[in-house]
Curated annotation (Swiss-Prot):
It catalyses: malonyl-[ACP] + acetyl-CoA + H(+) = 3-oxobutanoyl-[ACP] + CO2 + CoA. Keywords: Acyltransferase, Cytoplasm, Fatty acid biosynthesis, Fatty acid metabolism, Lipid biosynthesis, Lipid metabolism, Multifunctional enzyme, Transferase. The gene is fabH. Its EC number is 2.3.1.180. Its main location: cytoplasm. Homodimer. GO terms for cellular component: cytoplasm. This is Beta-ketoacyl-[acyl-carrier-protein] synthase III. It comes from Roseiflexus sp. (strain RS-1). Catalyzes the condensation reaction of fatty acid synthesis by the addition to an acyl acceptor of two carbons from malonyl-ACP. Catalyzes the first condensation reaction which initiates fatty acid synthesis and may therefore play a role in governing the total rate of fatty acid production. Possesses both acetoacetyl-ACP synthase and acetyl transacylase activities. Its substrate specificity determines the biosynthesis of branched-chain and/or straight-chain of fatty acids. InterPro entries: ACP_syn_III_C, ACP_syn_III_N, FabH, Thiolase-like. The last Arg residue of the ACP-binding site is essential for the weak association between ACP/AcpP and FabH. NCBIfam families: fabH (TIGR00747), PRK09352.1 (NF006829). The keyword Lipid biosynthesis applies. Gene3D superfamilies: 3.40.47.10.
Length: 329
């Protein structure tokens, strides 16, 4: 059994349609200045006809497989982190498994909202370390724009759609996940949620008329919890890894809001020059935001072989997760 699970392949996929702040000005009472000042977002990608969680995930997964130099038949496990599956069941990971041709792979979904990538990275790494898996395709994807009330300017300006994927394989040298800290607070579940569509509140015409199928959030409370928990779990993950913040080459945070990212960086005493930000172009892509940012950071050579990176995220649930990874590709 291997001690580590290296990321040997990576890829991303986003919808073709770009929705700018100027476009939103024609949909809801808002302005480019208002959105950028409060969020840092300029534009986001929005899924169109024929673009689903599965299709974006398959595209990102294929890119990751190509980068890893693996055939889909070599994948033994497919994991999808999402809270916006194609259907309530079966698992969308099964659709991905069939779509990429990984016929022999086990497949399952994992739900941890915007923290999903870091949660899933821990699960995939644990499977490889235990010997339960060798070649894992791990995808994080969300299509939140299908759960948005486009008349609610407090939420419709925030979200975008996308997918990010990594291939994980056994490694004897320190690689991939070095430390990980996960957390949750179910008592705060109502701070951000979609009410209708589950077993508690099955979707009915009455609930749909009330708009209960759309995401809602308490932005002020989410901000406070996010900064506190992302910073605390980040510092703990760095400590467990036996490092200091100065050893971290790049922080790759969940891309929810620029103010949250900046406030978290201040608590870590890490300059923004060492924090990767791309939410201005994609908005909040939920579980996909960290892997999309990671892929772009690698492509822009912000991460090099041997570097330590900090991944940190926060989402509905409430959930939060931070991890130190060592990049060896």
């Amino acid at each position: 059994m291997a001690n580590y699970a290296a990321m040997t392949g990576w890829g991303m996929a986003v919808p073709e349609r770009v929705l700018t702040n100027a476009d939103l000005e024609r949909i809801v009472e808002t302005s480019d200045e208002w959105i950028q000042t409060r969020t840092g977002i300029r534009e986001r990608r929005v899924a169109g006809p024929g673009e689903y969680t599965s299709t974006l995930s398959i595209a990102a997964g294929r890119a990751a497989l190509e980068r890893a130099g693996l055939d889909a038949a070599q994948i033994d496990t497919v994991i999808l982190a999402t809270c916006t599956p194609d259907r309530p069941f079966p698992a969308t990971a099964c659709t991905i498994q069939a779509g990429i041709g990984a016929r022999r792979a086990a497949a399952f979904d994992l739900v941890a909202a915007c923290s999903g990538f870091v949660y899933g990275l821990n699960v995939a790494t644990s499977m490889i370390r235990s010997g339960a898996a060798r070649n894992v395709l791990f995808v994080a994807c969300d299509i939140f724009t299908h759960f948005i009330n486009w008349n609610d300017r407090n939420t419709c300006v925030l979200f975008g759609d996308g997918a990010g994927a990594v291939v994980l394989q056994p490694s004897d040298e320190p690689a991939g996940l070095i430390s990980c800290v996960l957390g949750a607070d179910g008592e705060q579940e109502d701070l951000m949620a979609v009410d209708a569509g589950g077993t508690r509140l099955p979707a009915t015409p009455e609930l749909l008329e009330q708009g209960r199928q759309y995401v809602y959030m308490n932005g002020r409370e989410i901000f406070k919890h996010a900064v506190r928990e992302m910073a605390a779990s980040s510092l703990e993950a760095i400590r467990v890894a036996g490092l200091s913040p100065d050893d971290i080459a790049l922080v790759v945070p969940h891309q929810a809001n620029l103010r949250i990212i900046e406030a978290t960086a201040r608590r870590l005493e890490v300059p923004m020059e060492r924090v990767f930000v791309n939410l201005d172009r994609y908005g909040n892509t939920s579980a996909a935001s960290v892997p999309i940012a990671l892929v772009e950071a690698v492509e822009q050579q912000r991460l090099r072989k041997g570097d330590y990176a900090l991944l940190t995220a926060f989402g509905g649930g409430l959930t939060w997760a931070s991890a130190v990874i060592r990049w060896t590709a």
